[in-house]
């Protein structure tokens, strides 16, 4: 059935078909990666007309849908499932509102949801406020179903997809991926399968993003099995939208962690320069993956990721991560190590805490969190004459003159009662050590001795 909405859609689409074919032939990829100085949010949405890595002989299948017909969603999902393909579905907000069961089925099958505006207007004719309204109303429809597009957008009619103003408006709202396409099969015009397959043969390129339409009057659904078979006959495999916007070491790491099914979830940005040449970062729903030449790619997420970002991420004293977030041997906490000799440790009781430098080295020599000090409960702070970090079982003090030394137990209690580093004892110059009948710690201004029989702590001069 042809409706007025179908006619409007076809009129708008006709303007973009020739451009789509040209892009496929010339090999346009995406807008240049937007440099995010010091790991900052992108200033403009990245536009993907092909996958981020155009080398592999793979393609991504996507389908668009508006409100006027639901399309044969069960059949499309069955075809994709039978072929092991994860596709992208760009849906308008009014489609989501009218056909919630179909949208839930698409999401439950693991396919990528993409915000296609609320009611399919041309975006270059809208003000910033009107664009925001289109995005918000559509996303609200997804959220009422407990779903999200995670900041992915596809421009209706392909209108303004390369426009700097549109891209800036998207980025200002956290919609950092504009997921475009390489070529349109034109099944929405009701063309025979032979026409669709001819376009597949002519315009498919490595990394290509194939656009089809889900509407009931589109011939794409009927042609879908033949499209898949034709692509495979041409030597192409299939990737999914999630991995198609990643590349290189970050892409491999994301895939190795489980891609969208991992703690990272959906990609939120394209790969960006993290600080300078030879560095990269990509943001995801649940965290970020950083890469630096010679260090490799590592993820940071959750409370540790939030703390890392709050410290200044890779421009902070920590630098780049050199591990993924890793569980501690006792199973209680988690940690990331970083390139400049620092770590962030987290437990439910302590939160995410920073430990670094000579204090970290002392803590490590004493067994990390498995030693008597346990987990850090505070960050390193300045004290009289030096620096200190507090742990569950004691404290470590440092100065350039004295080095790093621990103080714990009853001796620490007496030390703090006498003013700690600000008192007459000053900074420690030894760890606690065994003496006849007890234990002792030495300080710049004297010593403290614990009696193993009485439990008393006495003090003396140097």
Regions found by a protein language model. Give the residues of each.
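Extended, compositionally biased repeat/scaffold regions that form elongated interaction surfaces
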Residues: 244-462
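N-terminal pre-catalytic segment of deacetylase/amide-hydrolase enzymes
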Residues: 2-62, 68-83, 98-104, 195, ...
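Active-site beta->alpha N-cap acidic-glycine motif
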Residues: 39-150, 218
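Catalytic domains of cell-wall/extracellular-matrix polysaccharide-remodeling enzymes
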Residues: 72-75, 97, 121-232, 236
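Residues at alpha-helix termini
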Residues: 82, 108, 144, 172-173, ...
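Structural recognition of the beta-strand scaffold that forms the well-ordered cores
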Residues: 59-62, 87-91, 112-117, 150-154, ...
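Residue-level "edge-of-site" marker
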Residues: 93, 119, 155, 183-184, ...
């Amino acid at each position: 059935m042809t409706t007025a909405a179908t006619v409007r859609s076809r009129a708008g689409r006709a303007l973009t078909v020739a451009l789509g074919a040209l892009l496929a032939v010339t090999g346009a990829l995406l807008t240049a990666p937007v440099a995010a100085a010091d790991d900052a949010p992108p200033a403009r949405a990245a536009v993907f007309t092909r996958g981020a890595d155009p080398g592999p002989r793979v393609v991504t299948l996507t389908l668009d849908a508006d409100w006027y017909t639901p399309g044969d969603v069960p059949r499309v999902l069955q075809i994709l499932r039978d072929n092991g393909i994860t596709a992208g579905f760009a849906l308008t907000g009014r489609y989501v509102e009218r056909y919630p069961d179909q949208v839930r089925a698409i999401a439950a099958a693991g396919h990528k949801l993409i915000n296609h505006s609320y009611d399919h207007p041309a975006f270059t004719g809208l003000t910033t406020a009107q664009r925001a309204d289109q995005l918000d109303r559509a996303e609200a429809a997804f959220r009422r179903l407990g779903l999200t597009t995670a900041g992915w957008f596809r421009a209706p009619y392909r209108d303004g997809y390369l426009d700097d103003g549109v891209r800036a408006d998207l980025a200002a709202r956290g919609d950092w991926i504009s997921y475009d396409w390489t070529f349109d099969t034109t099944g929405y015009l009701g063309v025979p399968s032979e026409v669709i397959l001819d376009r597949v043969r002519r315009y498919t390129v490595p990394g290509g993003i194939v656009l089809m339409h889900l509407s009931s009057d589109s011939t794409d659904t009927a042609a879908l099995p033949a499209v898949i078979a034709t692509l495979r006959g041409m030597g192409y495999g299939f990737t999914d939208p999630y991995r198609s916007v990643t590349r290189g070491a970050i892409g491999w790491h994301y895939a190795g962690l489980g891609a969208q099914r991992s703690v990272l979830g959906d990609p939120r940005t394209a790969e960006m320069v993290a600080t300078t040449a030879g560095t990269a970062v990509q943001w995801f729903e649940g965290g970020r993956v950083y890469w630096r030449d010679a260090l490799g790619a590592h993820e940071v997420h959750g409370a540790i990721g939030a703390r890392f970002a709050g410290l200044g991420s890779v421009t902070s004293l920590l630098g780049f991560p050199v591990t993924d977030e890793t569980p501690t041997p006792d199973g209680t906490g988690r940690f990331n190590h970083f390139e400049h000799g620092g770590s962030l440790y987290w437990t439910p009781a302590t939160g995410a805490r920073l430990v670094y430098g000579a204090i970290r080295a002392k803590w490590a020599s004493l067994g990390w969190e498995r030693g008597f000090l346990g987990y850090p409960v505070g960050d390193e702070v300045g004290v009289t004459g030096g620096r200190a970090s507090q742990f569950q079982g004691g404290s470590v003090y440092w100065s350039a003159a004295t080095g790093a030394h621990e103080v714990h137990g009853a001796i620490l209690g007496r030390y703090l009662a006498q003013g700690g580093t600000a008192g007459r004892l000053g900074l420690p110059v030894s760890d606690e050590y065994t003496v006849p009948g007890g234990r002792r710690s030495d300080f710049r201004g004297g010593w403290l001795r614990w009696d193993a029989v009485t439990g008393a702590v006495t003090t003396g001069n140097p």
